[in-house]
């Protein structure tokens, strides 16, 4: 029996030393030390031995078991270190290589245009002001010389939340809020960009669109100041070659009022389908702040005057980029958006 144990020891140690993987070591452990392993069978057969041989056989078998367990453990640790080293070599990173570029999106074309508009007016000395999109009927209409039952209210189909609260139909309420907050400070020179809401939805209208309101209030402000400001803006946005004209119009919150046209950016003013062969495109509305609006905001119209204007960001973007359908800006089509 001692010779059998010695043979098992020699064979097992040789196989353990030659093993090349953790799986192979586990198979050897089961073969020699498992419940049905070769060394286990020897120990179970000790009952058949003469009593005087049992101590020596048991002692040797236990010694071989401990030796095999130690060899398995040591070789397993060596294999683990070797496998880890190989894995680290395979996964090694060259930290001197440039990193993978981060894929970033672009600003939406409307906000690109809005940022351009803001940059031009900031360069002209205007501040940027903001106001609530959910507005009271007073600030949206009455404070802008649009009392209840005024026929001009029919020009703006509105989204009412309650009888006296609605989604603002223009950013003009911001001018009243700013004048009230800054009274009697002069000058007031602001633009108010933001979202506005009207019940329109077709190729040239959207129920949600973006508008920029402009306001300047000071002593001795004239219509000439308004013209000079808007001409400077349009030339910076569309190029020095653009021509500008002012047509008389009507807005309840300005008097006198005007529509501003510029020479068609598609044909240069020679006439085309886009400008209906007139050579001109409407771009914004403007005028001198109505005396009632000034007085309702706390200013004396005999002492101060001002001008205001409003333009649609989508309108500017459509003209600048030659787009004929407003809805393209809101359809989230990446083929369209990636062009900007």
From Swiss-Prot:
EC number: 6.1.1.20
GO annotation (BP), single: phenylalanyl-tRNA aminoacylation
Main location class: cytoplasm
Subcellular locations according to the entry: Cytoplasm
Catalytic activity entry: tRNA(Phe) + L-phenylalanine + ATP = L-phenylalanyl-tRNA(Phe) + AMP + diphosphate + H(+)
Keywords: Aminoacyl-tRNA synthetase, ATP-binding, Cytoplasm, Ligase, Magnesium, Metal-binding, Nucleotide-binding, Protein biosynthesis
The organism's place on the tree of life at top rank: Bacteria
Cofactor(s) needed by this chain: Mg(2+)
Note on how the cofactor is bound: Binds 2 magnesium ions per tetramer.
Residues reported in the UniProt entry to bind Mg(2+): 255
GO cellular component, one term: cytoplasm
Protein biosynthesis recorded as keyword: yes
Entry GO MF terms: ATP binding; catalytic activity, acting on a protein; magnesium ion binding; phenylalanine-tRNA ligase activity; transferase activity; tRNA binding
Family recorded in the similarity comment: Belongs to the class-II aminoacyl-tRNA synthetase family. Phe-tRNA synthetase alpha subunit type 1 subfamily.
Subunit structure: Tetramer of two alpha and two beta subunits.
Full protein name: Phenylalanine--tRNA ligase alpha subunit
Organism: Moorella thermoacetica (strain ATCC 39073 / JCM 9320)
